[in-house]
Amino acid sequence: MDDQEIRNRIVRKMLKNQIVGNHKKQIDTVVSKIAALPTHEEGRSKELLTEMVSNASAPIEGYGGGHRQNVRLTSVEDAVDYLKDNDGEVPFGFD
């Protein structure tokens, strides 16, 4: 998987699981359970997810403080637009 495929998969799975608003997850949980990425991709996936949090054009934001590194989608619309703009697959019912 290339980097953009990993980013798209993370956003798609977070959207499908509706991790938005008050619903948040830890970075480790998103990578290992929500996105269900292969173990050999987990390290790079965590790096990409962390980069996306600090990138204003990405639909993912950090939430809360402390050591837990919680993330959530900025909005459903932002996630759908991101996937469309980056040749990602939008989950059924969100398009």
What do these predicted regions represent?
Residues 1-22:
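Short alpha-helical segments that sit at the start of domains
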Residues 11, 45-53:
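Short, hydrophobic-biased segments on the C-terminal half of alpha helices
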Residues 28-43:
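Short helix-coil junctions and helix-kink-helix linkers
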Residues 34, 66, 94-95:
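Long, compositionally biased intrinsically disordered regions
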Residues 53-65:
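A short, conserved structural fragment
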